[in-house]
């Protein structure tokens, strides 16, 4: 069944968030900071590992790099597009709208929970590659594995950030579901290299999210989201400008 992985993912986040909300009521305030930092450290290593797996190469016993210029161009151009569209502010506005209608009074971290969880659950390599596998091959295995991880993460997020994590199922459904459906139409042009490049950019964004979690910084990761899909643009442009294919 096409899209099964995304449906399972939505279900595990709903269950995990519910468990986290129940735990939140009995979780001392001093635990929250440590829980978030622990989740941030885990996220950090996931992001670094995903990036290095695509950037580093080993040939004839020597370590080299690949796709570094492409990565720089995607992030720079993606930032320009994202800032022009003001994606993160739109996410926050949507979260604030839902907070005003559905959140309990005093739930001051509702928007933060929605934005942080949505970005983490959507920008990673597993979301991209898993959704593509589901669409191309009808294989939801990777998305189901991601669903389990997201379920655990949603427990921790909800325990610290509250009910806003529930709302992350909306971007999960449309983002992963959209990639799955899109994969059916762009199947002839997708290559392992292209998928790897998209995953690499996504892993860098995961690392950026980890900095927000650990240091409570304000990197606007949402405005970098277009960067994930720019390797597709460079792939098609390389047909007319072969030099781009060497980035």
Q: At which residue positions do the language-model features occur?
A:
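Juxtamembrane boundary at the C-terminal end of a transmembrane helix
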Residues: 235-247
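Helix-loop-helix junctions within the multi-pass membrane cores of secondary transporters/permeases
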Residues: 99, 108-187
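Cytoplasmic-side transmembrane-helix entry/capping segments in multi-pass membrane proteins
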Residues: 31-41, 95-97, 166-175, 222-229
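Alpha-helical transmembrane segments in multi-pass membrane proteins
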Residues: 8-16, 20, 24, 40-41, ...
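Structural signature of hydrophobic alpha-helical transmembrane segments
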Residues: 2-15, 66-73, 135-147, 190-204, ...
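Intrinsically disordered, low-complexity non-transmembrane regions of multi-pass membrane transporters
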Residues: 1, 29-30, 85-113, 245-247
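Membrane-helix boundary connector in multi-pass membrane proteins
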Residues: 211-222
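A generic, lipid-embedded transmembrane alpha helix
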Residues: 39-55
